[in-house]
Design a protein with these regions (language model features):
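Glycine-rich phosphate/diphosphate-binding loop of Rossmann-like nucleotide-binding domains
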Residues: 2-40
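Active-site-proximal loop->helix
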Residues: 21, 46-49, 76, 93-105
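N-terminal beta-loop-helix "entrance" segment that forms/cooperates
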Residues: 33-54
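Short, glycine-/small-residue-rich phosphate/pyrophosphate-handling segment
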Residues: 91-138
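Glycine-rich phosphate/pyrophosphate-binding loop and the adjoining helix
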Residues: 129-164
């Protein structure tokens, strides 16, 4: 199975990435995590992106806040799928990062999830890999089924609590 590359702009993004890591682990998807900055370590970020396919990666998740150029910088240097996680900061509640991540020029796509959307970034990568992996596909089907069962259980609990 291809692995997922996870790149965050700084260690302040780790709480968001932890959810991504937990989701990938639960789906038994291998991954690596790195800190590269589009502004402070552009050469390292570029080198990682350019060699990602040869190093066994199937997709790359990038998490960054504020100017959030990381996903775009990575996408400019690879043809692998890049998923951007705009991270909330104390300035503009992450809207600046969302706009920086989602507004890419034609020809250099970045799939963008919600602000702090680490779980959905992992699930999107899993869906990409599951196109050619039946076992992973089944784990995703099972995960969705479990989610539906949890909602129905809560529905019954609320009805019971309200005496309905």
């Amino acid at each position: 199975m291809k692995k997922i590359g996870i790149v965050m702009g700084s260690d302040s993004d780790l709480p968001i990435i932890q959810k991504t890591v937990d989701t990938l682990k639960s789906l038994e998807i291998p991954f690596e995590v790195h800190i590269y900055s589009a502004h402070r370590t552009p050469d390292e970020a570029r080198d990682f992106a350019r060699s990602a396919r040869e190093n066994g990666f199937g997709a790359i998740i990038c998490a960054a806040g504020m100017a959030a150029h990381l996903a775009g910088a990575i996408a400019a240097n690879t043809s692998l799928p890049v998923i951007g996680i705009p991270c909330k900061s104390s300035v503009l509640d992450g809207v600046d990062a969302l706009l920086s991540t989602v507004q890419m020029p034609s020809g250099i796509p970045v799939a963008t999830v919600a602000i702090n959307g680490g779980v959905n970034a992992a699930l999107l990568c899993a869906e990409i890999l599951a196109v050619s992996d039946d076992e992973l596909y089944q784990r995703l089907v099972d995960l969705r089924k479990q989610g539906a069962e949890n909602v129905l259980k809560k529905d019954a609990e609320v009805a019971s609590r309200l005496g309905l």
